[in-house]
Design a protein with these regions (language model features):
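Beta-strand residues in well-ordered beta-sheet regions across diverse protein folds
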Residues: 45, 53-58, 80, 114
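Residue-level signal for well-ordered alpha-helical segments
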Residues: 21-23, 32-33, 56-58, 89-90, ...
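Disordered, acidic Ser/Thr/Pro-rich linker "stalks" and the adjacent N-terminal cap
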Residues: 1-45
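N-terminal start-of-chain detector that recognizes signal peptides
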Residues: 13-18, 27-29, 49-53, 84-86, ...
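Sequence-level detector for tyrosine residue identity
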Residues: 6, 15, 61-63, 119
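A short beta-strand element within beta-rich, extracytoplasmic domains
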Residues: 50-68
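Trp- and acidic/polar-enriched beta-sheet ligand-binding modules for extracellular glycan
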Residues: 36-41, 63-138
């Protein structure tokens, strides 16, 4: 797993990409840019070619309802596969896990998700996800 950047908060807590697949909704990946993170990305290495059909996304910081509303959430995302093809999606602004389906099942060895636009949080200008699960048909 890789990312364009990640946030380290004032207490030294690092919000790295590995937080996206740890099974814990109270952890997260946040981009570490000085702005809202447009163009930032996170990349899942699938460990070989897998056939993927979509993903399940826990958008924003699910530590609590309060923290979810205070941080930015992704609105528009671009998903890129290892062959360079891309698909775009608009996520909802709800604290519910969202299933995203690709146009067709795709053989790929990586899935990269790029932030294209956001829903603004009430306090913090960082954007992230608590969990992302790649749906593998292999």
């Amino acid at each position: 797993m890789d990312s364009s950047s990640y946030l380290v908060d004032d207490s030294g807590q690092a919000y790295e990409a590995k937080g996206l697949s740890d099974g814990k909704l109270n952890s997260a990946w946040f981009e570490g840019d000085d702005s809202s993170g447009l163009g930032s990305w996170v990349k899942f290495d699938l460990g070989g070619t897998k056939t993927v059909s979509g993903m399940k996304v826990w958008n924003g910081y699910w530590y609590s309802q309060d923290q979810w509303s205070r941080h930015n959430r992704a609105k528009d995302i671009e998903v890129e596969f290892s062959d360079g093809t891309k698909e775009s999606f608009t996520l909802t602004d709800n604290m519910t896990a969202e299933q995203v389906r690709f146009k067709a099942a795709k053989a790929t060895d990586s899935v990269q998700i790029k932030l294209k636009s956001i829903y603004r949080g009430s306090t913090f200008n960082h954007t992230g996800f608590s969990e992302i699960q790649i749906l593998d048909q292999s």
